[in-house]
């Protein structure tokens, strides 16, 4: 089971936030995450693994402040220790930065690059945020592998279409260039012929 929430800010469209029911489900989320996903977890404490799905073309720097705090509060609220504390640090990083090795416990992860891990602090629990998110909560039993494959297939098709469009434009540009070269060649030829005609005419006048 995966829990889905909706978050939005004043200046952006809605974002999807999701988290697994337990550490075993977290394994599937780690395995089948998307490049657009940002992972959240309470720093140095046990907590839920919360993911924010960015819009295509966005990166971690583009997360609206309101959406960032929604994710941080949701993580804090789903930490047995963290939910009782103030000034809780929450770490977040792109899904692609998560490192999972065979010797790690279920639900445990590391990072490929520590420099790509960011921290946001939740000073205290804000019920208004949690209540708002709770109203958007939806429980689903998704086929994460199938959804990931569908996403990847769409991306491959988009890239294929972009390559085809690029080739079409290149072909069109080559055609235009060839036509311009032919036109310049024809114009140059006509100019030479005109000059020859004028010279012939002048010679004829001189002999009259």
UniProtKB/Swiss-Prot annotation:
User: Coiled-coil annotation: which residues?
Assistant: 117-187
Q: Per the record, what is one GO cellular component?
A: endomembrane system
Signal peptide (UniProt feature, chain positions): none
Q: Which residues lie on this side of the membrane: Cytoplasmic?
A: 84-208
Question: At the top level of its lineage, which domain of life is listed?
Answer: Eukaryota
Q: Which InterPro entries match?
A: Jlp2/Ccd25, NFACT_RNA-bd
Q: Which UniProt keywords apply?
A: Acetylation, Cell membrane, Coiled coil, DNA-binding, Membrane, Phosphoprotein, Transmembrane, Transmembrane helix
Please give, as recorded in its UniProt entry, the membrane topology of this protein.
Single-pass membrane protein
Q: So where does this one cross the membrane? A: 67-83
Entry's Gene Ontology molecular function annotations: DNA binding
Modified positions (N6-acetyllysine) are 23
One example of a Gene Ontology biological process annotation: positive regulation of cell motility
Give me the Extracellular side stretches, as residue ranges. Answer: 1-66
The record's subunit annotation is: Interacts (via cytoplasmic region) with ILK.
The Swiss-Prot or TrEMBL record describes its family as follows: Belongs to the CCDC25 family.
**Protein name in UniProt:** Coiled-coil domain-containing protein 25
Task: Name the species this protein comes from.
Answer: Pongo abelii
Q: Which gene encodes it?
A: CCDC25
């Amino acid at each position: 089971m995966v829990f889905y929430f909706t978050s939005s800010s004043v200046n952006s469209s809605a974002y999807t936030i999701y988290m697994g029911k337990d550490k075993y489900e977290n394994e599937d989320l780690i395995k089948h995450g998307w490049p657009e996903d940002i992972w959240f977890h309470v720093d140095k404490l046990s907590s839920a693994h919360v993911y924010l799905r960015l819009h295509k073309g966005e990166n971690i720097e583009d997360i609206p402040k309101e959406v960032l705090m929604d994710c941080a509060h949701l993580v804090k609220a789903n930490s047995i220790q963290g939910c009782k504390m103030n000034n809780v640090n929450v770490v977040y990083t792109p899904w692609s930065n998560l490192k999972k090795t065979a010797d790690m416990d279920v639900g445990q992860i590391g990072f490929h690059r520590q420099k790509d891990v960011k921290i946001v602090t939740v000073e205290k629990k804000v019920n208004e945020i949690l209540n708002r998110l709770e109203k958007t909560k939806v429980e689903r039993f998704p086929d994460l592998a199938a959804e990931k494959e569908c996403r990847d297939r769409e991306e491959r098709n988009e890239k294929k279409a972009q390559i085809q469009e690029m080739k079409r434009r290149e072909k069109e540009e080559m055609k235009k260039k060839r036509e311009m070269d032919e036109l310049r060649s024809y114009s140059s030829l006509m100019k030479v012929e005109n000059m020859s005609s004028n010279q012939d005419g002048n010679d004829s006048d001189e002999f009259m």
